[in-house]
Amino acid sequence: MRAKTVINDLIFKVMQKFDLKDVCFFDCETTGVPAKGLKWDADFKQFPHVVQLAWSLGDKEKSYIIKPDNYEIPPETTAIHGITTERAIAEGVPFAEVVDEFLADANAAPLVCAHNIYFDSSMLKANVLRYCGREYYDAHVEDALHKGKRIDTMMKTIKFVGALYSNGRPGKYPKLEELYSKLFPGETFPAHDALEDIRALRRCVPELVNLGIIELAQKEYPAEQLKAQFEPEKPKGGRNIEFHDPNPVTEPIGTGEPVPEPTPEPERPAVPLNSKTRELLNENDF
């Protein structure tokens, strides 16, 4: 146990703690999920589009449908979130206008929180590069969404909610509906509306804090882990994101997907951070 603490101390330091009013909750609905192997920085033109973006900060709530820019919303994703191409054209606001307002609030907030934050932040980053350009990205996105501010309720609740293998290891990434049902038995909410999702998430977080599963605190990472390098990367296989965890999980692609059962490995002593460990840390954009 002490070895794990030492390693984590080297990875980041927990900074000042905050209250719920200091958290910017956000969620987006999209035209789909990225094809396997695509990277938001190198392959942003091939990423799906954002269909709806909602967020809250303190008493403020915002929700916008995005006006399509020469693309169609596939029927299979409309079946999930209910937003058609026709509705988005009639009611939508250009992505650049919406994301500018969101990033102003996210930048002002000490913490940002989402369920599967890697997916939502990657979708936003890719679409910022597509519609706003790299100069805008550099000026606005890194500070607003940097990993030291992030809270990911999906990754934090895998063991709390997820179905388990026979050996006790986590079997899947929990959907927000599953987390909500676990915390509030018998209750539901209208999932896959971005605004309703953040309302549900905002209700879950205080319960998770009380259970000791998450804390409302910033983390300080080495500077080299916080900036995107915008260099194409070769696709890599599953990567362990919990160092020296007896029940490791692999990096998510989408909410609710099964986690491949890892091959048991012998106990290994803790080692100081080396170049390979730093490389793994740098790849995991959480």
PLM regions and their residue ranges:
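Metal-dependent phosphoesterase core characteristic of DEDDh/y 3'-5' exonuclease domains
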Residues: Q16, K21-D22, K36, K45-I83, ...
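Flexible, glycine- and charge-enriched loops at secondary-structure boundaries
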Residues: F44, A88, G92, A191
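N-terminal intrinsically disordered, compositionally biased regulatory/targeting segments
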Residues: Q229, E261, P266, E283-F286
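Short secondary-structure capping/turn segments at boundaries of alpha-helices and beta-strands
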Residues: F12-K13, W40-D43
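Short linear clamp-binding motif
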Residues: A3, R239-P246, A270-F286
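Metal-dependent phosphoesterase signature
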Residues: I80-F102
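Acidic, proline-/serine-/threonine-rich low-complexity intrinsically disordered repeat tracts
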Residues: D245-L273
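N-terminal accessory regions of nucleic-acid-interacting proteins
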Residues: M1-C28, G32-A35
